[in-house]
Swiss-Prot record:
Heterodimer of an alpha chain and a beta chain. Beta-2-microglobulin is the beta-chain of major histocompatibility complex class I molecules. It comes from Mus cervicolor (Fawn-colored mouse). Disulfide bonds join C22-C77. One of its GO terms (cellular component) is MHC class I protein complex. Residues 2-91 form the Ig-like C1-type domain. This is Beta-2-microglobulin. The lineage of its organism: Eukaryota, Metazoa, Chordata, Craniata, Vertebrata.
Amino acid sequence: PPQIQVYTRHPPENGKPNILNCYVSQFHPPHIEIEILKNGKKIPEIEMSDLSFSKDWSFYILAHTEITPTESDTFACRVKHVSLNEPKTVIW
């Protein structure tokens, strides 16, 4: 099943714009759905890297979006894939 890592490009500081990355790897077949959530709601505009594959033919992809974290906001990455019984959510 897919491995999911959620991290920011720069050290997070409340009120400072940042990029939230959701790196998903070790999945096969290549079809996958990735959402970035803010307070449980899908962020509509996210960027996706090209789908790539590793030496072992598993796939990986990076989804990212600009965020401005605050104390009260929660961000997460939700992944839907055929190898998962239900969507997997990882909170940042």
